Structures are given as C-alpha cells and as structure tokens.
A protein has these predicted regions:
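Short, glycine-/small-residue-rich phosphate/pyrophosphate-handling segment
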Residues: 148-175
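Acidic donor-binding segment of Leloir-type glycosyltransferases
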Residues: 51-75
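Catalytic metal- and UDP-sugar-binding loop of GT-A-like glycosyltransferases, i.e.
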Residues: 112
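Conserved donor-nucleotide/metal-binding helix-loop-beta segment in metal-dependent transferases, i.e.
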Residues: 116-145
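A short, N-terminal amphipathic alpha-helix
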Residues: 35-52
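Short phosphate-binding loop-to-helix
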Residues: 67-108, 166
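Conserved alpha/beta core of the MobA/IspD/sugar-nucleotide pyrophosphorylase nucleotidyltransferase superfamily
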Residues: 165-234
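N-terminal nucleotide-binding beta1-loop-alpha1 segment
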Residues: 1-22
C-alpha cells in the first residue's frame, strides 16, 4: 500500500518532566533542550515524506508548540484533564486522530514517537508502502517491546496502546507488525545507552548541533539526504 495522503500525529510531554532516565548524563536544562532538538529532527524527517501531507502535535508545553508551528506543523490542544489522566499519551493521540478523521476522512493516520533523531524519511516512506490498507500496523522499537510508529488507514480507528509493552498490546489488539531494516525509526532515546546508539547511527542536524555544543560524541548528519539517500517516490 502507498496511501494517497497520511497525517502524522506526535504527542510530546512537558519539557520539565522529559527524559528523567537521562539524569545521569545530562542536567535538566540540557535534557529539555535535547527533547526539543530530537523533536525538531523527527518532524523534519516526517515532513520530507511525500505521502505525509500534514503533521499534528499534541503537547501542553509552549516551547514545543512554538517549535511545531515554526516547523509547519499544526498544534492540537491537549484534552481537558490530561494532566490527571494515567493514560494521557494515548488519550491525546486518540483525540487528535479523531479530529483529523473528521477533517480528512480519506487520509491515513500515523502516530509517531517524538524522540527519533536518527529517523530517515525513506524509512517512513517504506513503512507506508508496506502497511496494509485493511488494518492497523505497527513498527516495534529497537528493543522489540515498545512501538515506534502506529499506522491506521482511512476508515480504521487508531486505537493507540502506547506505554509499557505497547508492541505486544498493539499486536493483541489486531495491529499487524511490519518488519524492515529501519534502524533510525526504531531507535528512540530514553537512556544513556539509547543516546549512544543513536549517535552511532548519526543524528539529524538539530540534535547533532546540541551534542556538539555539549561536547558529547556524535556523528553529524549534514542533511537528511546525504546520509539517508533520496526519498523514494510513492
């Protein structure tokens, strides 16, 4: 399948509470800046995919909202009471997906993690090409337990189940797992080991610039196309 159009949805927590498992590597202010940089590289990579015709960001954070708009994305308001919701991420994604369905009933919806600084556009293009048109599909993260991306074609609810063991939860809820060599898509960043792994892949320019400033080891990705190659036509 290669859908005519897809809208990507990305949910991002407040920068104040982001990436606590990197506390042993980065100070709080630097963790916030890292989240913002990784988000920027993720959005830029998604925006470079021809089939992705729009990106919507759900966040309570004004800095993320401002960055999203500067990158050409829309900002969807976080659902009321989300701060007290133990399943706030899935509630936010589902709410945004429902709103998108009402506006673009013929488009697919792709829920994407916000911390994929090594993401290459052709990885997402390949995912959308291989995704079924009659059911949801997931791409597991590098550990095989989480979900890097969840796709729902037109007419099928997204039904996000992100969180602990989300890959298993999505599979048991009917989503088909897609298998492909997509290391940048699968490598989210939660721990120091994850940060080292994505540095070995090469990161997008925003993340690379921050790592350079912080004098952490890095490989600079000057442009997405230089390292990833051209995005295949749909």
């Amino acid at each position: 399948m290669c859908p005519h159009s897809v809208h990507a949805v990305i949910a991002v927590k407040s920068l104040d509470s982001a990436k606590s498992r990197l506390a042993g590597v980065l100070a709080p202010a630097h963790r916030s800046r890292l989240v913002l940089a990784m988000f920027t590289d993720t959005v830029r990579a998604a925006a470079a995919v021809e089939a992705i015709t729009g990106i919507t960001v759900v966040t309570p954070d004004p800095a993320i909202s401002a960055a999203a708009r500067a990158l050409g994305a829309e900002v969807h308001p976080e659902p009321a009471g989300a701060g007290a919701d133990p399943d706030a991420l899935n509630t936010a994604l589902a709410d945004a997906a429902t709103a998108l369905r009402s506006r673009y009933p013929d488009s697919g919806v792709l829920a994407l993690q916000a911390d994929l600084p090594g993401l290459c556009p052709q990885e997402l293009a390949a995912v959308l090409t291989s995704a079924p048109n009659d059911s949801r599909a997931l791409v597991a993260d590098h550990a095989g337990t989480g979900t890097a991306a969840l796709f729902a074609p037109a007419g099928i609810p997204l039904r996000p189940r992100f969180g602990r063991d989300s890959a298993h939860r999505h599979r048991t809820d009917g989503a088909r797992e897609l298998h492909g060599d997509w290391p940048g898509l699968r490598q989210d960043v939660d721990t120091a080991a994850d940060l080292a792994a994505v540095q070995s892949l090469g990161t997008g320019p925003a993340t690379a610039a921050l790592l350079r400033e912080l004098e952490l080891p890095y490989r600079v990705r000057e442009t997405v196309t230089q390292v990833c190659g051209p995005v295949p036509a749909p």
